[in-house]
Swiss-Prot record:
Protein name: Aspartyl/glutamyl-tRNA(Asn/Gln) amidotransferase subunit B
Catalytic activity as recorded in UniProt: L-glutamyl-tRNA(Gln) + L-glutamine + ATP + H2O = L-glutaminyl-tRNA(Gln) + L-glutamate + ADP + phosphate + H(+); L-aspartyl-tRNA(Asn) + L-glutamine + ATP + H2O = L-asparaginyl-tRNA(Asn) + L-glutamate + ADP + phosphate + 2 H(+)
BP GO terms, sorted: glutaminyl-tRNAGln biosynthesis via transamidation; translation
Organism in which the protein naturally occurs: Listeria monocytogenes serovar 1/2a (strain ATCC BAA-679 / EGD-e)
GN (gene name): gatB
GO molecular function: asparaginyl-tRNA synthase (glutamine-hydrolyzing) activity; ATP binding; glutaminyl-tRNA synthase (glutamine-hydrolyzing) activity
Assigned protein family: Belongs to the GatB/GatE family. GatB subfamily.
Function: Allows the formation of correctly charged Asn-tRNA(Asn) or Gln-tRNA(Gln) through the transamidation of misacylated Asp-tRNA(Asn) or Glu-tRNA(Gln) in organisms which lack either or both of asparaginyl-tRNA or glutaminyl-tRNA synthetases. The reaction takes place in the presence of glutamine and ATP through an activated phospho-Asp-tRNA(Asn) or phospho-Glu-tRNA(Gln).
Protein EC: 6.3.5.-
Keyword ATP-binding attached: yes
Ligase is among the record's keywords: yes
Origin: domain of life: Bacteria
A Pfam entry, by short name: GatB_Yqey
Quaternary context: Heterotrimer of A, B and C subunits.
InterPro entries: Asn/Gln-tRNA_amidoTrfase_suB/E, Asn/Gln-tRNA_Trfase_suB/E_cat, Asn/Gln_amidotransferase, Asn/Gln_tRNA_amidoTrase-B-like, GatB, GatB_C_1, GatB_Yqey_C_2, Gln-tRNA_amidoTrfase_suB_CS
Length: 476
């Protein structure tokens, strides 16, 4: 029997506000444990929450960016559960009236585009953080408690691990462009749970789902889904049944293990938050927030293709992160050719960032010095090979491209007389290569070009070397 996989993703994103959603405590990552707290976060008796307007507006902006309808009337609810990192014994969330509903984003997998529906986007507060030690006790940090979150719930439209990965990449890119979050999974500002079920191909009814947690990277989301697909298929083929449960992805083994039997909404005993009034959002407020949304990656990608003549793949890669896209645009403003700037950013720059595990702003590169280097290549001052040395110097230490070339003595040798002298000397020492060339062995030319480049430490003008080398060999 063959099965179809059905996946829905729940993505939590921390909003980049200065203070928490219901208290005045700072909402910054990395502080000493239990220092970013107030009596509201600690759940002290008699304290009252105060709604952070900026968190609401960030939620509206994110919802609009993923094509959600914004509610005219929304409210907050209490989700009741007891856990050490939740001092109040309830979480303030949104149950039946979320701030955004009925959205969608478009993904592309294997050259095919597909719309993934968004069921809802709602606001809520984050919980604290438990650290379980090997000594039989746990440490609780309340700093994260009350940090504003949006939860984005997809429709069960995803059919493979690859589609789930593409959905997360696209969602991260869109949220990043809006500026409401830095969406860094390594810092916990973007987290994902996956709901997975399988059903016989052709069956309309959904199978019993399991929820996967501890998915701390996009790759782990993919691996967890792939494992769970196989596990559920093996259970059904052996005559077993799938239990509705929550499972943990174990990164070390690549497998999932039981955490607990999955709760339903009734288990949380939702009821309207009595300490917060309902929220009404009028058209004027919506339009003001909509006007703040910048050009999003899909539109920017189309502009790069139509206006700059970039290939679709280049446009997609350049717009994947806002930092890379903004850097590219600033490089064009600084005078660089669009295709050359694209090639450098997608090639050497991306390779350097991956190898060094850095982001653009953590290097010495600027749009101005990258554009300056590209202009030096176009002017023939340096070759593409020399440019790689210049690039590394700029990436590591910053500075001006032209000054680096002067200081390092990297100006390309384009003097015909100097090159002819070097070529003549190399031909005198490699007479067999001349014979091979005249016998039709083209590899001999490549060897001799390499000898010239070696003699000039890579600074000879390559097209001129080829031209002069052929001229000198034909004279002999």
């Amino acid at each position: 029997m063959n099965f179809e996989t059905v996946i829905g993703l729940e993505v939590h994103v921390e909003l980049k506000t200065n203070s928490k959603i219901f208290s005045s405590a700072p909402a910054h990552f990395g502080a000493e444990p239990n220092t970013n707290t107030t009596v509201v976060d600690l759940g002290m008796p008699g304290v009252l929450p105060v709604l952070n307007k900026r968190a609401v507006e960030f939620g509206m902006k994110a919802a609009m960016a993923i094509n959600c309808e914004i509610a005219e009337h929304t409210k907050f609810d209490r989700k009741n559960y007891f856990y050490p990192d939740n001092p109040k014994a309830y979480q303030i969330s949104q149950f039946d009236k979320p701030i955004g509903e009925h959205g969608w984003i478009e993904i592309e997998v294997g050259g095919k585009k597909k719309k993934i529906g968004i069921t809802r986007l709602h606001l809520e507060e984050d919980a604290g953080k438990n650290t379980h030690t090997s000594h039989g006790y746990s440490l609780v940090d309340i700093n994260r408690q009350g940090t504003p979150l949006i939860e984005i719930v997809s429709e069960p439209d995803i059919r493979s691990a690859e589609e789930a990965y593409a959905y997360l990449e696209k969602l991260k890119s869109i949220i990043q462009y809006t500026g409401v979050s830095d969406v860094k999974m390594e810092e916990g500002s973007m987290r994902c749970d996956a709901n997975i079920s399988i059903r016989p191909i052709g069956q309309e009814e959904f199978g019993v789902k399991t929820e996967l947690k501890n998915l701390n990277s996009f790759n782990n989301v993919r691996k967890g889904i792939e494992y769970e697909e196989k596990r559920q298929a093996e259970v059904l083929k052996s005559g077993g049944i799938i239990e509705q449960e929550t499972r943990r992805f174990e990164e070390a083994t690549g497998k999932t293990s039981l955490m607990r039997i999955k709760e339903g909404s009734d288990d949380y005993r939702y009821f309207p938050e009595p300490d917060l009034v309902d929220l009404f959002i009028d058209d004027a407020w919506k339009e003001r927030i909509r006007a703040e949304i910048p050009e999003l990656p899909d539109k920017r990608q189309i502009r790069y293709i139509n206006d700059l003549g970039l290939p679709a793949y280049d446009a997609m890669v350049l717009t994947l992160t806002k930092e890379m896209s903004d850097f590219f645009e600033a490089t064009l403003v600084a005078g660089a050719d669009a295709k050359q700037a694209s090639n450098w950013l997608m090639g050497e720059v991306s390779a350097y960032l991956n190898a060094e595990q850095k982001e653009l702003h953590e290097t010495g590169l600027t749009p101005e010095n990258l554009a300056g280097m590209i202009k030096l290549i176009e002017a023939g001052t340096i070759s593409s090979k020399i440019a790689k040395k210049v690039f590394r110097e700029l990436a590591q230490n910053g500075g001006d491209a032209e000054q680096v070339v002067k200081d390092k003595g990297l100006v390309q040798i384009s003097d015909e007389g100097a090159l002819r002298t070097i070529i003549s000397e190399i031909l005198d020492n490699n007479e067999q290569s001349i014979v091979d060339f005249k016998n039709g062995k083209d590899r001999a030319v490549g060897f001799l070009v390499g000898q010239v480049m070696k003699a000039t430490k890579g600074q000879a003008n390559p097209p001129m070397v080829n031209k002069l080398l052929l001229e000198e060999m034909n004279k002999r």
